[in-house]
C-alpha cells in the first residue's frame, strides 16, 4: 500500500485539529487463477500436478522482479498532472513462482482453485512482451501446467502445456488466469483483469485454450 498527501497546516503543530487526509492505493498487482476441464470425460480422470509462472516455456528463465523501490515523488501530482511512474525495478534479480505443486483431483467443468478462492499472488507491476529481433531485451512470462490423465484401461499420460502471457500487469489491478485443460488437443487459458480501484475491483481475465481460440503454445 502507498499514499501521498500534500497539505499546509495553519494551526499550531500541537493542535488536535491538524489532520492530513490520505487515500491509500495498492502498489502491487494481484494475480489469481482457476482451473477446470474442457468437458467431462467418462473414460478418463485428471490430476493436476503443478502450475508454474516462469520466464520461458521450460522454466529455466526467471520472470518476476524480486525487489524494487517506490519513489513517491514520481506519483502523479493532482495539480500539475506530471508523473513518471511509481516503481523503480532497475535490479535484474528475478524469480519464478510455483503457483501450485501437489495433487489435485477434484477437477470438473466448473472452475475451481486447488488451494482456496482467495489465494492470490502479489507481484511488482511489470510488463510482459514477446521477444523479437528488434526488441530482444523484454520480459517474457509463461504459465506452465503439468497434469496426468488416467484412462479407463489404467494407462496414464502426463502432459506439460504452456502459454505465453503478453500483458502489462499494472499496480492496483487484479488479474485472473482461468486455465482449462483436457485431452492433449484441448487447452485453454483466460486472463481476466480488474479495474484499478482501492478494493481491487473486478478481475481482468486471461482465457487460454480451445474455447477462446487462444490455444496453449505447446505440449510436452
Question: Can you name each region flagged by the protein language model?
Answer:
Residues 23-39:
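A short, Gly/Thr-enriched small/hydrophobic beta-strand-prone motif that recurs across taxa
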Residues 1-23, 38:
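Short N-terminal edge-element motif at the start of the domain
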Residues 31-33, 49-56, 75, 190-195, ...:
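Generic beta-strand hydrophobic packing signal
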Residues 169, 173-220:
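Intrinsically disordered, low-complexity repeat and linker tracts
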Residues 8-9, 42-173, 210-220:
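Tryptophan-paired
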Residues 2-3, 35, 53, 147, ...:
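Hydrophobic side chains in beta-strands
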Residues 19, 30-32, 174-176:
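Intrinsic-disorder/low-complexity, polar/charged segments enriched in Ser/Thr/Lys/Arg/Asp/Glu/Gln
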Amino acid at each position: 500500500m502507498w499514499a501521498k498527501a500534500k497539505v499546509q497546516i495553519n494551526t499550531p503543530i500541537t493542535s488536535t485539529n491538524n489532520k492530513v487526509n490520505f487515500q491509500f492505493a495498492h502498489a502491487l498487482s494481484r494475480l489469481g487463477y482457476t482451473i477446470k476441464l474442457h468437458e467431462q470425460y467418462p473414460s478418463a480422470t485428471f490430476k493436476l500436478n503443478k502450475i508454474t509462472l516462469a520466464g520461458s516455456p521450460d522454466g529455466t528463465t526467471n520472470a518476476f522482479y524480486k525487489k524494487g523501490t517506490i519513489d513517491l515523488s514520481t506519483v502523479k501530482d493532482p495539480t500539475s498532472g506530471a508523473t513518471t511512474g511509481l516503481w523503480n525495478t532497475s535490479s535484474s534479480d528475478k524469480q519464478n513462482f510455483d503457483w501450485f505443486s501437489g495433487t489435485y483431483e477434484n477437477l470438473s467443468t466448473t472452475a475451481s482453485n486447488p488451494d482456496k478462492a482467495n489465494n492470490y499472488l502479489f507481484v511488482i507491476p511489470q510488463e510482459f512482451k514477446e521477444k523479437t529481433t528488434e526488441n530482444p531485451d523484454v520480459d517474457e512470462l509463461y504459465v506452465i501446467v503439468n497434469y496426468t490423465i488416467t484412462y479407463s484401461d489404467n494407462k496414464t499420460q502426463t502432459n506439460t502445456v504452456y502459454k505465453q502471457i503478453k500483458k502489462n500487469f499494472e499496480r492496483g489491478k487484479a488479474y485472473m488466469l482461468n486455465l482449462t485443460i483436457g485431452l492433449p488437443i484441448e487447452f485453454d487459458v483466460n486472463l481476466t483483469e480488474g479495474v484499478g480501484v482501492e478494493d481491487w475491483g473486478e478481475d481482468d481475465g486471461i482465457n487460454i485454450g480451445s474455447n477462446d481460440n487462444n490455444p496453449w503454445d505447446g505440449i510436452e
